[in-house]
Amino acid sequence: MAAPLLEKLSESLGSPEPAIRLILSVLVGYPFALVYRWFLFYQPATVVHLFHICSGLALAAFNFGSQLYHSAVCVFVQFLMLRLMGRTVTGVLSSFTFQMLYLLAGYYYTATEEYDIKWTMPHCVLTLKLIGLAFDFYDGGKEPSQLSADQAKAALPSVPTLLEVFGFSYFYGGFLVGPQFTMRNYQKLVSRELTDCPGKPPNSVVPALKRFALGFLCLAMYAIFSPSFPDTYLLTDEYEAQPFWYRCVFILLWGKFMLYKYVSCWVIAEGVCILAGLGYNGVVNGKHQWDACANMKVWLFETTPLFGGTIASFNINTNAWAARHVFKRLKFLGNKTLSHVATLLFLTIWHGLHSGYILCFSMEFFIITVERQAQALVLDSPLLTSLANSHFYPFVYIVQQFIHWLFMGYPLVPFCLFTYDKWLKVYSSVYFCGHLFFLVAYLILPFLRITLVPKKDRREKKQD
């Protein structure tokens, strides 16, 4: 009965059926959260775990059918490794190796040349959860002084039970599209600690509805505008025949609206977590915070003229996971740049095996490097600082935003088109303008520094 209805809905909306199933599965998290609040909040932990497991498995079955066994196998193996290997480096390395190899094998055997919603999509979220679980269990055996603040907060004092591991993995608010959260936070949710009124369900309905409304607005924008900017048009002769400026503006608008696909899912899923209580983040300046599961800072995403600002506003929990479990654990390298490169390399492999991911993340690293040098130049140059603080700044801001979104869309081309032949065709059609722009900027910034920064300031900077 459901299949024909979904088929008709898919046809009427002009969206693939797997995408319809996915968004419905994210939305059904709201009634699941209400069931938990109304009927299960005061129930024993075992009942809550079973509810999370059954609801998550139901979502997996609805979207991927019998392929849900992939997640079940990985969760069970992870539990066995925690139990049998204990708090050891071997346990962490075994978990990391097994979970990543399973994910990469999934990518390899299900790979196509287009973006498909298949079991590997939620599995990449699960992979980070389970690797993070191994790290957090290992950290629980260390002295707090050996850990960073966020690592100490997530460290597990004891091995979790089988029900805890499965409930944590299949929690309906984060199983399909994230966000990432720790086992400690999940345990606090089940023990009724994540609430603004102790002993009662949290007053989180209004904050959850606000995120739902914002997410739905982003989803509507994606549904309205994305059909006008399809990925496939980038590969057509018609696109190649357009003027250069048109091709660039198309990439700008395409990249902007394409990202709403991710923004909408993450913000709606965040609302589910808030409604259940998992989004509770304590009190700051007398106000209860509900941003523990925030994966997007939408206002910053929309208004920042900086590439670094967009990265800071986008996929926040995944970036925080990478910082906590990869970047900060590479201190032994003694070089932040090397740690940054290694972290980006991990995220590249985690996303998939296509060449487009490598190019996208390498471009991100290069763009951020150039932007930081440009920011330092503006801060050190009296002329540029005065210009940035003058009445001309609104004009400068508009130019910044154009450059920012043009070259945000530019590295997204290989990210979305995946294969060498496709992204090379698009980059050739715009004469590799993004590569050339940032290469030229990288080469001339040292000379601009000599020209625009007083010698005294340059000497002081060198000494620092």
How would you label these PLM feature ranges?
Residues M1-D464:
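Non-catalytic, membrane-anchoring transmembrane segments at the edges
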